[in-house]
A protein has these predicted regions:
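Long, contiguous N-terminal structural blocks used for assembly/anchoring
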Residues: 1-57
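Intrinsic disorder/low-structure terminal segments
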Residues: 6, 31, 35, 42-43, ...
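Acidic, low-complexity, intrinsically disordered interaction modules
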Residues: 57-85
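Alpha-helix boundary/N-cap detector
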Residues: 9, 13-17, 21, 62, ...
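Surface-exposed polar/charged interaction patches
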Residues: 24-32, 46, 77-85, 105, ...
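Short, compact, well-ordered microdomains
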Residues: 91-113
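Intrinsic disorder/low-complexity detector
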Residues: 43, 47-50, 58-64, 72, ...
């Protein structure tokens, strides 16, 4: 039997849904492993070209800087390595755990903490 090749589909995600995930992570979902600073006054103004989110990994001691494109990359990684969280996000049934996994995918390209 021939191996079936998967399809790749591109979808457009509204900015407010990405901001929802970011909010869930920053306001509770990821506070157990990270501290945050932002380059602009509004943490959620991801359209500002100077927007940068500094993420301090309190366990690992490293600091990471995220840009808008890292959010898109993180969402793609979320869909690949924790598809049930991605599915919850798409169905608008996401929670703080989904938001935390999203942020970890943005920062580490993996889910390191659980």
């Amino acid at each position: 039997m021939k191996e079936l090749k998967p399809f790749t589909v591109q979808i457009t995600i509204p900015k407010d849904r990405i901001v929802d995930l970011l909010c869930g992570a920053l306001e509770g979902g990821s506070n157990y492993w990270a501290h945050f600073q932002c380059s602009v006054d509004d943490f959620y103004d991801i359209d500002d070209p100077t927007w940068r989110l500094s993420v301090d990994d309190v366990d690992g001691g490293d600091t990471f800087t995220l840009k808008r494109e890292d959010l898109a990359k993180g969402l793609q990684i979320l869909s690949e390595i924790v598809p049930h969280h991605y599915s919850n996000f798409i169905k608008e049934d996401d929670d703080a755990e989904t938001a935390d996994c999203f942020l970890q995918c943005c920062v580490f390209e993996d889910v390191v903490y659980s």
